[in-house]
Amino acid sequence: MKKFGGVDYMGIDGLFSEDELAVRDAVREFVDEKVIPVIGKHYEEGTFPRQLIPEMAELGLLGSTIQGYECAGVNNVAYGLLNQELERGDCGVRSFVSVQSSLVMWPIYTYGSDEQKDHWLPRLARGEAVGCFGLTEPDHGSDPGSMVTRAERVEGGFRLNGAKMWITNGGIADVAVVWAKLDGEVHGFLVERGTPGFEAPEMKHKLSMRASVTSELTFNDCVIPEENLLPGAKGLGKALRCLNQARYGICWGVIGSAMACYDEALNYSLERVQFEKPIASYQLVQGKLAAMVNEITKAQLLNLQMGRLKDKGELKHQQVSLAKYNNVHQALEIARSARTVLGANGISLEYQTMRHACNLESVYTYEGTHDVHSLVIGATVTGIEAFR
């Protein structure tokens, strides 16, 4: 396979700092050397490449924006770029880092006690512990406020009952950030692996996100100690802030998938000869490639502006919704178009495109469905909430 050289039609690399490019290039090399050679096998077998966790930790990819606690402390643009490169390898790898960083380490750092931070954050940063995030339930997805998982006070702690569904990293997690209603209000809790009454069976037979661990979390009279309550995690809004952190990384990640598909289609079209000339010489194929690089370029600029706003503390969740709404849709369209350039070869695991396309079908839904984000944008521009 030809080495990936990036997609930069408008000279956008010149808008990044040296430090930001250094992070991107280090992760790009890691993906080329360690992820891409093994990911097809893991995708086919439905397994997550756990052997990559120590190397990702060594690169500082886990909780990378957090200051202290053995974390890298990079800015949000660099974090976006590392998500982009990871998903160029596979969405399952990017999802692992995204969940560990934005949905586990970030809420512990933001809402946790000093003791919780000291105990968990260094271990999570080193990859010695893995975390997951439990919000979605079997019957409560886009409306998490209607969750039925409950916590009640007992002597020395809390008793949890309920279930969570579609939980990334659940089956391999050492700790779960779980959201449950206590006295009618949503609170965040830490539930550790091995706690009696807590199980995390893996969900099998997926046709998407196959190189990612997806699990159900069940709580049957699961008693946790008082100190496992996240003291600052009171109210549904605190859970939604976590999702917005993860959603930011998704917006960058899917463009990594789009770049991989475009790059593969471009190289294939230059080598594939039909009617005595490369198919890249035909107007129909050139039109598809032009549309791909056009949408990638627009998404790159959107992501960069979003990252700069986030680094200044000015990014609004509605703006992240627009980026996810645009970028995931365009990445999926690029993957589908790239598959047509590859023809029948496009459905083979020998090529990347169909794997990315299948993964993007999940990303289109998780962390806020495409339709729900359209309602968020609609409410922002009209001032009228259609979903209330």
Predicted segments, located by residue:
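Short glycine/proline-enriched turns and hinge-like loops at secondary-structure junctions
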Residues: 74, 143-145, 169-173, 210-212, ...
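A short, Trp-centered hydrophobic/proline-enriched beta-strand micro-motif
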Residues: 127-135
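Flexible, small-/acidic-enriched active-site or ligand-binding loops
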Residues: 146, 194-225
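Short beta-strand-to-turn element immediately C-terminal to the catalytic PLP-Schiff-base lysine
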Residues: 110-112, 152, 178-181, 190-192, ...
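Short Gly/Pro-enriched turn/cap motifs at secondary-structure boundaries
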Residues: 124, 139-142, 166-169, 181, ...
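Alpha-helical interface subdomain recognition
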Residues: 1-91, 96-99, 111-116, 123-128, ...
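A short core secondary-structure module
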Residues: 148, 157, 161-200
